[in-house]
Amino acid sequence: MASSLKKLITSFLLFFFYTIIVASSEPSCRRYKSIISFGDSIADTGNYLHLSDVNHPPQAAFLPYGETFFSVPTGRDSDGRLIIDFIAEFLGLPYVPPYFGSQNVSFEQGVNFAVYGATALDRAFFIEKGIVSDFTNVSLSVQLNTFKQILPTLCASSSRDCREMLGDSLILMGESGGNDYNYPFFEDKSINEIKELTPLIIKAISDAIVDLIDLGGKTFLVPGSFPVGCSAAYLTLFQTAKEKDYDPLTGCLPWLNDFGKHHDEQLKTEIRRLRKLYPHVNIMYADYYNSLYRLYQKPTKYGFKNRPLAACCGVGGQYNFTIGEECGYEGVGYCQNPSEYINWDGYHITEAAHQKMAHGILNGPYATPAFNWSCLDAASVDNESSFGS
């Protein structure tokens, strides 16, 4: 009898502790009060526009950039909204303002340090390697240091202390690292040379996350890479007459997409390591690759043209893209219906594609672990219906 009772108590305790462990491993629902963003053009809401020489403004300073939603150029590298904009809409927050160049703007509900052309690794690294990366010197570490410098000011304008403010924020870490690969690829470096950068890039992203955790960050969304083998720029740069070099379903270049997967696998491994070190922090992996690649696999299912590899805005060649005659330059045309296209300017994607990606990340299955929206009211969650699926 005593033995049976002992077994029963032991079983109960095991079940009890298992329940606690499982519950603690699942992300709790949070009502985020702000978005803090780092990265490159994938998330840049206007920083590069303000950092540029006024006599040599970037292409995103001109129409048709911004025409679909904002009706004017905002510095976003798309015809309209980006993933970060759709995340802000879903959370009921204002669009995240760029830090650089903003005047009389409140950063209490968000601030964005992402800059077009930015790298995860510092500019000095590329100079030493003989790789040109002269779009900007605002690398991930520079963005983070800028954030640290202004953090006391951000906290002073809020009723919350600094750790509480970061704890209530969704911290978007990019995409970061894409340009670290773009520059050497466009200088015709070998793929083995470029692969050597991956551990360094992953470490730079990881170090930034750890710094932000030390400051009080509790929720991170860490994007992986894009399937660049489907971008008009890469398809043009590495165009070949060999049919076997292309994916028969999508028309993309598999070897380039495999490189993106190589990066993502290492990033996911590092995120798993960080989760073990910081079990109280929710570090979500955003699968940008598959969230976008599905659109290339079944374009008509998602409202896009069949085989939508050509850029909407551009000129020349099979993919409507020519280096030196890109979107935003005088005389370069653009399509009448950007919502039917995935590729926008050869490097970036359209608002319609961003919208589909954002839906897949916020509502699954492209965030790991998935967001928990159980504490939001039904009306808030219903807002996702505007994303499409």
Swiss-Prot record:
Tissue: Expressed in most tissues or organs of the mature seedlings. Not expressed in roots of mature seedlings.
Entries under SUPFAM superfamilies matching the protein: SGNH hydrolase
The keyword Heme is annotated on this UniProt entry: no
Keyword terms, alphabetized: Glycoprotein, Hydrolase, Secreted, Signal
Catalytic activity: O-sinapoylcholine + H2O = (E)-sinapate + choline + H(+)
Compartments reported by the entry: Secreted
Gene3D superfamilies on file: SGNH hydrolase
Protein name in the entry: Sinapine esterase
